[in-house]
């Protein structure tokens, strides 16, 4: 079910050809020039923690603009690409790749690339910007702290000092495998959804039970269908929305600028129930009190086809126990909470797949003052900058739920905002104003069914960026660079003039961020 990594001829498909042409034009217009071989970037020097998509993308932007980056990765080089280096061979993008353009130089060969092509693009980006010599593999970051001069130290002084830090550890760490009663009695394999390919699990002609109802369950279902399982039963505890695998629909749903349920939210919910779920699957949709703009949806159309033709079943309930060849489930009706009343049902299974997700990587390596209530993550400035440290940004590892994409061009915008703060002291926000922005966002989203930063949409994120640049006149000169990654020389020339005008010492004193 996952798309093949062997792309079809672009010339035989006009839309694909136009898409690839657009990608090439964006690459030529917006990709920073790779640094010269064996060249040393100028200050600022930035530490990047994590070598997944976010870490490699951020480091490539930093080096492409002539600055220095060092990547710290806890795993070996085989884990370059983060979670994509560890998932199944059948895994692929659920959203269209137009929403997964994590760098301007990425050139997708098709709309829904598979794992192999995604990892290939990450490695190509890593090599293009000369990050091989700047990556420290097998180096787990235990502590990030500042010296007396305010520069950052990672683990210890042996790695040198850094002007800024980007934390890019993501949200998917070690596989989560909760114990189930009777697991030792089950005669077949019990395996995590991310290890199906690695462990060569044979599901051909077998009954497969998938424990879990999120993105991992979709991945496991794709693997089972691709390998011709006889029957697949998804056992989901949660009530999650499923949306079509359609670029236009997905983009429209991310355009709710308020980032919360509104009086018009019933419209997309009604449309999904009546035209995507349909009358035969409407019971699988979340109850009316579970709004769409409260949780991350699953993006898949094939699953609905499998449910309609009987190859798969979707049961809502709680796992009671495993027996020798079955899973006992407390099956609940729609709207009944987890562990609520239901009735027992026996699901026969030859293979049990634990689609239970991943442990979230810890941010405990950061200074304690990053986690002071009520401004703990995700309640940070622009959701990534802790109020005490505008020289530190945790990109793609603080969000809870969203409608949009974690692998899109916001990675570059966040990185360039950090560079702006590092280069130009007059643009740096003070801790007071960073906290006031958090308070303002909470006020604007008061009354929402979720906490202010527990859910957002992509258009809301863009609005945050626009507000960040517009609210401070000294940031206006950086707007083109921040949003498009071009024209760095113009704001840098302004910075030099401002420094001479204000006197360098007075210029430095205008930095109110405690991390400088």
What are these regions (language model features)?
Residues 2-32, 382-383, 390-516:
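C-terminal, flexible cofactor-proximal segment of oxidoreductases
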Residues 3-16, 48-133, 230-231, 236-247, ...:
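Beta1-alpha1 glycine-rich phosphate/pyrophosphate-binding loop at the start
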Residues 20, 33-41, 53, 58, ...:
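Rossmann-like dinucleotide-binding core of oxidoreductases
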Residues 49, 160-173, 208-211, 346-359:
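Short hydrophobic core segments
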Residues 111-173, 307, 321-326:
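Feature captures the FAD/FMN-dependent oxidoreductase FAD-binding
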Residues 133-135, 188-189, 311-313, 392:
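Short, conserved active-site loop motifs that form the nucleotide-linked donor/cofactor pocket
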Residues 189, 193-199, 325-328, 344-345, ...:
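FAD-site-proximal beta/loop scaffold in flavoenzymes
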Residues 284-370, 449-516:
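C-terminal catalytic lobe of FAD-dependent flavoproteins
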């Amino acid at each position: 079910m996952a798309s093949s990594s062997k792309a079809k001829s672009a010339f035989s498909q006009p839309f694909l050809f136009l898409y690839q042409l657009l990608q090439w034009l964006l690459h030529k217009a917006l990709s920073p020039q790779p640094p010269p071989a064996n060249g040393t970037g100028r200050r600022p020097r930035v530490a990047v923690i994590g070598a997944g998509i976010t870490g490699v993308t951020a480091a490539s932007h930093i080096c492409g603009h002539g600055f220095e980056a060092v990547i710290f990765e806890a795993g070996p080089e085989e884990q370059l690409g983060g979670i994509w280096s560890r998932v199944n061979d059948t895994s692929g993008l659920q959203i269209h790749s137009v929403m997964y353009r994590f760098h301007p130089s990425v050139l997708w060969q098709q709309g829904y690339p598979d794992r192999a092509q995604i990892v290939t693009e990450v490695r190509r980006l890593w090599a293009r910007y000369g990050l091989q010599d700047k990556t420290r593999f097998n180096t787990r970051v235990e502590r990030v702290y500042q010296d007396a001069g305010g520069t950052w130290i990672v683990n210890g002084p042996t790695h040198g000092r850094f002007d800024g830090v980007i934390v890019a550890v993501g949200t998917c760490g070690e596989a989560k495998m909760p114990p189930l009663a009777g697991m030792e009695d089950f005669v077949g394999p019990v395996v995590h959804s991310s290890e199906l390919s690695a462990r060569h699990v044979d599901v051909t002609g077998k009954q497969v039970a998938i424990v879990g109802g999120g993105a991992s369950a979709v991945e496991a279902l794709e693997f089972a269908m691709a390998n011709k399982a006889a029957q697949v039963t998804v056992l989901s505890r949660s009530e999650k929305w499923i949306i079509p695998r359609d670029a236009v629909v997905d983009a429209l749903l991310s355009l709710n600028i308020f980032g919360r349920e509104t009086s018009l939210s019933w419209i997309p919910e009604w449309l999904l129930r009546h035209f995507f779920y349909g009358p035969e699957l409407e019971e699988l949709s979340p109850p009316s009190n579970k709004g769409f703009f409260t949780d991350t949806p699953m993006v898949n159309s094939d699953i609905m086809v499998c449910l309609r033709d009987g190859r798969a079943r979707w049961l809502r309930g709680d796992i009671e126990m495993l027996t020798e060849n079955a899973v006992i489930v407390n099956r609940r009706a729609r709207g009944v909470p987890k562990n609520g009343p239901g009735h027992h049902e026996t699901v026969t299974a030859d293979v049990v797949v634990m689609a239970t997700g991943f442990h979230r990587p810890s941010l405990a390596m950061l200074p304690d003052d990053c986690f002071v209530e009520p401004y703990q993550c995700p309640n940070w400035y622009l959701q990534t900058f802790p109020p005490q440290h505008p020289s530190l940004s945790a990109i793609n590892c603080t969000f809870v739920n969203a409608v949009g994409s974690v692998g899109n061009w916001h990675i570059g915008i966040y990185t360039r905002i950090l560079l702006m703060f590092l280069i130009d002291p007059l643009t740096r926000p003070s801790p007071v104003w960073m906290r006031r922005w958090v308070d303002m966002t909470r006020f604007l989203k008061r009354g929402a069914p979720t906490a202010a930063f527990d859910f957002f949409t992509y258009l809301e994120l863009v609005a945050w960026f626009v507000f960040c640049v517009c609210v401070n006149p000294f940031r206006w000169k950086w707007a083109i660079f921040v949003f498009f990654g071009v024209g760095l020389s113009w704001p840098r020339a302004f910075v030099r003039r401002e420094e001479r005008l204000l006197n360098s010492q007075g210029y430095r004193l205008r930095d109110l961020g405690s991390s400088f």
